[in-house]
Amino acid sequence: MVGVNFFGDFDLASLAIWSFWAFLAYLIYYLQTENMREGYPLENDDGKLSPNQGPFPVPSPKTFDLADGRKIVVPSVENEEAHRRTDLALERTSVNEGYPFRPTGNPMLDGVGPASWVPRRDEPEVDAHGHNKIQPMRKTEMKVSAGRDPRGMPVQAGDTEVVGKIVDMWVDIPEQLVRYLEVELNSGKKKLLPMTMLKIWSDRVRVNAITSDLFDTIPDIKSPDVVTKLEEDKISAYVAGGYMYAKGVKPYAL
């Protein structure tokens, strides 16, 4: 018997359990340090390095080859600066860390608080074939096969004012779902509205997040047929910020 003849009185069960705990400890260490490739070292609210960096060290830089041919090195100063916003229109409410900041201007236009956005790459998201994932339905062969087609419906703001009408639907082609509705405002401007922040009724499209006076300042897109990742973030952040900052929102009108 192996336990007697080869190992003598060595406890194989003890070896197995302690080997497992050692492996688990290493796995936790590895996963945590890999998780620290972006967003570290930790900073205080004022941007200075935090005196408490935690028990795990920041890993050494590693180069990743991306699907689009780019290379990214993380952690790196260049990568952190590419995702950093400066000169935010905010002021401290306390000298202590962890307290909220107060907007100093128009938080929805400044992109702070609930309306915050991240400086993503100013390029469209593409699918596995290199095609733009999100496109207006007028540029595709897709059609509405079930449910309500909102095109042509009036758009009702959170204060119950009608601000325009829906002229198109922007579709995530690989996912086969609608991401945005394109609205033509009474002023003639065209804007995108996130599908998750509106409700399609039988006779209108209701946007409860923002009031009629806020539609003209929804962030624009540079191309009429393309929306970039940066533009997506700004549009979604602006509309979502209205849930806190918009004044005069009324209950759903029946």
From Swiss-Prot:
Cofactor or coenzyme needed: a bacteriochlorophyll; a bacteriopheophytin; Fe cation; Mg(2+)
Topology in the lipid bilayer: Single-pass membrane protein
Gene Ontology annotations of biological process type: photosynthesis, light reaction
MF annotations from Gene Ontology: bacteriochlorophyll binding; electron transporter, transferring electrons within the cyclic electron transport pathway of photosynthesis activity
Single GO cellular component term: plasma membrane light-harvesting complex
Keyword Amino-acid biosynthesis set for record: no
Major localization class: membrane
Family: Belongs to the reaction center PuhA family.
Protein name: Reaction center protein H chain
The organism of origin for this protein: Rhodobacter capsulatus
